[in-house]
């Protein structure tokens, strides 16, 4: 489980382009008889999946690796103030995305108790989230927030 954020203008074309290719790769994997063929096919599924989710999508898990939490923000407390319900979807305006990006840029992360590799994960995640929010702002696109 986690928070899934989408910039539909970027994500939907990726989904449309790669969904069928992934389905074919999954069928190939599932019909493979040898474990080496299954492994090879799974690598192709993973590769296509990573490409499909490489644009217009950001995910934050609901566990100790939640990036937003390390900056003392909450999907349940703060996001309702930054989003509104539009036809059953939680949407964040481009203006609120820019505001949140600015707030996050200034926030320090509480990374006490994490090792160097984990700290790097959080720093990278923070930068990716800020870039994601700024992309929505620059494109003047709302963010769909599945939280």
For the regions a protein language model found, what residue spans apply to each?
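Acidic (Asp/Glu-rich) sequence patches and key acidic residues
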Residues: 1-147
